[in-house]
């Protein structure tokens, strides 16, 4: 049970700090806001990786959990429980943020929670972006955490840095999710376009995770 609760706490922190930074920076499209938001999400992952990594592996993302399930690093039961607790954690994090913010966030369709949406770029562009970026992110996770070929103690740093890069690329198009839990939590409070576009930020990251698992099986497993 401890590992499930660790996933809840980790996802809550990621959602609160990452989305909270986006809202604090008015979810702007200017360089400073984009970079600041990207760095916040990356640092939140690094912090949690070294805090709860030894307890749960610090997935804090259903897409990562799916990638681990498809590469047989986690059981079906644990994967399901991880995802449930991740979503609960994200909802709690978004609720806390929603409770103390009243910022007007016009970028990517969000207002008070840093929620994701496809904005003016359209569903197709958003779906492609989230699928490709999630595939890259999950591939980094699978490779850097591999028991034999991974980066060992540096895995958390590699994962956090890759998330920064992915946000730098994707924020302009979708606000960058690559994490269904984070998107669900924010969208529930955001409503509007964020809620109507939510399916993209669930289906696309899962598709990307499946692609990443397939790639890793092809290049990383013996």
Regions found by a protein language model. Give the residues of each.
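Membrane-interface helix-loop junctions and terminal tails of multi-pass membrane proteins
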Residues: 1-222
């Amino acid at each position: 049970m401890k590992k499930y609760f660790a996933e809840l706490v980790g996802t809550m922190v990621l959602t609160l700090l990452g989305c909270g930074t986006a809202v604090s920076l008015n979810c702007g499209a200017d360089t400073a806001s984009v970079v600041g938001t990207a760095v916040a999400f990356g640092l939140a992952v690094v912090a949690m990786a070294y805090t709860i990594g030894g307890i749960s592996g610090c997935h804090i993302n259903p897409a990562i959990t799916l990638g681990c399930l498809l590469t047989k690093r986690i059981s079906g039961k644990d994967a399901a429980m991880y995802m449930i607790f991740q979503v609960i954690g994200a909802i709690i994090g978004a609720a806390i943020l929603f409770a103390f913010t009243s910022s007007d966030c016009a970028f990517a369709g969000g207002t008070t929670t840093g929620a994701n949406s496809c904005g003016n770029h359209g569903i197709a562009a958003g779906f492609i972006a989230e699928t490709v970026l999630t595939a890259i992110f999950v591939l980094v996770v699978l490779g850097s955490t591999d028991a034999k070929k991974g980066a060992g103690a540096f895995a958390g740093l590699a994962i956090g840095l890759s998330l920064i890069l992915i946000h730098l690329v994707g924020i302009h198009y979708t606000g960058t999710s690559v994490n269904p839990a984070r998107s669900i939590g924010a969208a529930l409070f955001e409503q509007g376009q964020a809620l109507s576009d939510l399916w993209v930020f669930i289906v696309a990251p899962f598709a990307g995770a499946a692609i990443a698992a397939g790639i890793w099986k092809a290049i990383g497993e013996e």
